[in-house]
From Swiss-Prot:
It is an enzyme of class 4 (lyase). This is 4-hydroxy-tetrahydrodipicolinate synthase. It comes from Clostridium tetani (strain Massachusetts / E88). Its EC number is 4.3.3.7. GO terms for cellular component: cytosol. Keywords: Amino-acid biosynthesis, Cytoplasm, Diaminopimelate biosynthesis, Lyase, Lysine biosynthesis, Schiff base. The keyword ATP-binding does not apply. It is found in: Cytoplasm. Catalyzes the condensation of (S)-aspartate-beta-semialdehyde [(S)-ASA] and pyruvate to 4-hydroxy-tetrahydrodipicolinate (HTPA). Its main location: cytoplasm. Pfam families: DHDPS. Pyruvate binds at T46, I205. Homotetramer; dimer of dimers.
Length: 294
């Protein structure tokens, strides 16, 4: 059974002077539920987990689970390039009631394809909770190859899905051909939602949903219900805005956009920094063109 179908928001973490702005996070959670977001993915890349302390990560995940109260699935980013650390955080996340885990490939260490399998198997064997793998070689320097994914699925009963952000549609098609319905595929790129749905994907883990939650949900729902032309229209109509959210490293533009829109999510944490002025002007133009600001 799928953890979710449709739009899972890779939600930003709002910060304030004292740390995480939990009042704002609660507002965001309620806003997403009201606007039909299908799942919340907390403490991922867009949530700046890499600049948060372990205590902040745990408090943020628990707060989210407590506030959502089972209304939609909560998926926690508990991956690491330290297998033991990933196991410990994943065990803890299970204990407080998350619906799934998002596990990034082990970055920086430069392990082999065999090492990728063994890393995920170690987590799988110690933590009985649904797992979404996160393949984003542009960030990690490590690509889960299709045949490697087959080996993972053969040995890891809790691995139920993959967030595919390689951008390589040929690779994703090969994954689907090899595994059929043994694993769910989520788009990890907002500009490839429709292409990935068209080859059997079931949704997206989305950055765009932070500012257009209803539109991303509708795009997925329409496609999955067979209304493919209307779904494609949303993809095409939001494409220029989507592209503007990636003119600098995510989540710099999306967090900047939210602040411009009056959704005060606070500052970015170093080493992420404020946008270049020319890129900022382009972002503002796209927000205006899509009626998100006046």
């Amino acid at each position: 059974m799928s953890i979710f179908k449709g739009s899972g928001v890779a939600i930003v973490t709002p910060f304030c002077e004292n740390g995480v702005n939990f009042k704002k996070l609660e507002e965001l959670i309620e806003w997403h539920i009201e606007n039909s977001t299908d799942a919340i993915v907390i403490c991922g890349t867009t949530g700046e987990a890499s600049t948060m302390t372990e205590a902040e990560i745990k408090e943020t995940i628990k707060f989210t689970v407590d506030k959502v109260q089972g209304r939609i699935p909560v998926i926690a980013g508990t991956g690491s390039n330290n297998t033991r650390k990933a196991i410990e955080l994943s065990k803890w996340a299970k204990s407080i009631g998350v619906d799934g885990l998002l596990l990034i490939t082990p970055y920086y260490n430069k392990t082999t394809q065999k090492g990728i399998v063994e890393h995920f198997k170690a987590i799988n064997d110690d933590v009985d909770v649904p797992i979404i793998l996160y393949n984003v070689p542009g960030r990690t320097g490590l690509n889960i190859l299709p045949k490697t994914l087959v080996k993972i699925c053969d040995t890891c009963s809790n691995v139920v899905a993959i967030k595919e952000a390689s951008g390589d549609l040929s690779q994703i098609i090969e994954m689907k051909a090899l595994l059929k319905d043994r694993i769910d595929i989520y788009s990890g790129n907002d500009d490839q939602i429709i292409p990935i749905l068209s080859i059997g994907g079931i949704g997206v883990i989305s950055v765009l949903a932070n500012i257009m939650p209803k539109e991303v949900h509708d795009m997925c729902e329409l496609y999955l219900k067979g209304k493919t032309k209307k779904a494609l229209e949303i993809q095409l109509n939001t494409l220029s805005l989507t592209n503007s959210l990636f003119i600098e490293t995510n989540p710099i533009p999306v967090k900047t956009a939210m602040n411009i829109m009056g959704i005060d999510v606070g500052e970015l944490r170093l080493p992420l920094c404020n946008m270049d002025e020319s890129n900022l002007n382009l972002l503002k133009k796209e927000l205006s063109n899509h009626a998100l600001i006046k």
